[in-house]
Amino acid sequence: MADQISGEKPAGVNRFALQCAIVASIVSIIFGYDTGVMSGAMVFIEEDLKTNDVQIEVLTGILNLCALVGSLLAGRTSDIIGRRYTIVLASILFMLGSILMGWGPNYPVLLSGRCTAGLGVGFALMVAPVYSAEIATASHRGLLASLPHLCISIGILLGYIVNYFFSKLPMHIGWRLMLGIAAVPSLVLAFGILKMPESPRWLIMQGRLKEGKEILELVSNSPEEAELRFQDIKAAAGIDPKCVDDVVKMEGKKTHGEGVWKELILRPTPAVRRVLLTALGIHFFQHASGIEAVLLYGPRIFKKAGITTKDKLFLVTIGVGIMKTTFIFTATLLLDKVGRRKLLLTSVGGMVIALTMLGFGLTMAQNAGGKLAWALVLSIVAAYSFVAFFSIGLGPITWVYSSEVFPLKLRAQGASLGVAVNRVMNATVSMSFLSLTSAITTGGAFFMFAGVAAVAWNFFFFLLPETKGKSLEEIEALFQRDGDKVRGENGAA
């Protein structure tokens, strides 16, 4: 294994690899900011542009439907132009979308801005974790590949804070500044990422062996580790291990994603089917368990629980952002020590309990007309607990796991397919939550999410093997074993 040369313990995280992953993950801060700030902006958009609940649902969810398109395009795009330039493209799209939203003279223009930004989100959510995973060593891949989700949480918290302070501005100015200010960091990132190296795995897949090896030497902890990683990637790319050329023609090999969809969807091997099931399953359950309802509609949920003033609503919502960021940061430190599987099962188990408590608290509060103090406190504690349990496991592990389980030649488009499922579920929840609460009450909606989370726990327990500490090439071999051997790797959780 590349991280355990001659039986030595893995060295500390490579600083240059960490810098690369942080810069790539900044695009996730911008996306997170949009999610957080939209929860407050919609309160004022509804009043300023005289929109109804259905229009608000469409406005919040359309970004994710467009992100679906972006994510499906991102896999092939990143295989052709590279991971780095795909991040640049994502930044430019999000910048243009932010400018349109900041202008927003009417609902159609605002909607077009959300669509443009959504395309950028789709590109970013697919490529940032893949880039980080391909830069990182196996012993620190969980840390680096979880950075995008940590940055999403930081962005959400920033959005909640901006909501609180900009809400004091005149209404027609406040919400436009909330949405438009995201154009500035998008522009900075587009230039900043150009100073970062390309993914060494992508370069080697293109036959650019010398460039790929030079970058591996920069992001590895020793020359021996770099050489071992280099040989592993060459083998995965189908390059003769004895080849010492600087550049190799990759004739007949799938270097730009040709034929990959056939291998993924039409004629997958048993191993690829198993990878697809686990990767798409974890993306499905991440949003089907209701996290977007709390993040996007937090002010409305807390209003149902009994909080009335806008200042108090935004302050309590900031608490959601603090919990999310704190526990995501904790998860980044634990992923490579505790492992993906144990954290995931603990996380989802806690979510089931918290969602049940939230459903009960909101039901009691609504039945009493929002005048039960204990029901209000229970609802706030349960919402915070739900976000905390989500953030320490299911939140970051979804992106880490799906970026590392696909074989090298299928990784970019496999990851893009996972993001597509993720965005569909995000859009489904965000575009239906208000209608759902009208049909079965807000408390009933969270009881339903608790049931989904319980199903998710069983799915993860029986189907997801541990990948902690394994190189990407070793993970590929893990999924090629028969089902009994894979289940044997799981242990007793």
Curated annotation (Swiss-Prot):
Coiled-coil stretches: none
Topological type in the membrane: Multi-pass membrane protein
Gene Ontology CC, one term: membrane
Keyword 4Fe-4S among UniProt keywords: no
Matches recorded under SUPFAM superfamilies: MFS general substrate transporter
Keywords, in A-Z order: Membrane, Sugar transport, Symport, Transmembrane, Transmembrane helix, Transport
Compartments (UniProt record): Membrane
Pfam families: Sugar_tr
Chain ranges passing through the membrane: 25-45, 54-74, 85-105, 116-136, 142-162, 177-197, 275-295, 313-333, 343-363, 372-392, 414-434, 444-464
Gene Ontology molecular-function annotations: carbohydrate:proton symporter activity
Main location as per UniProt: membrane
Keyword Protease belongs to the record: no
InterPro entries named among the record's database cross-references: MFS_dom (IPR020846), MFS_sugar_transport-like (IPR005828), MFS_trans_sf (IPR036259), Myo-inositol_Transporter (IPR050814), PLT1-6 (IPR044776), Sugar/inositol_transpt (IPR003663), Sugar_transporter_CS (IPR005829)
Function: Plasma membrane sugar-proton symporter.
Recorded family membership: Belongs to the major facilitator superfamily. Sugar transporter (TC 2.A.1.1) family.
Name of the protein: Probable polyol transporter 6
Gene for this chain: PLT6
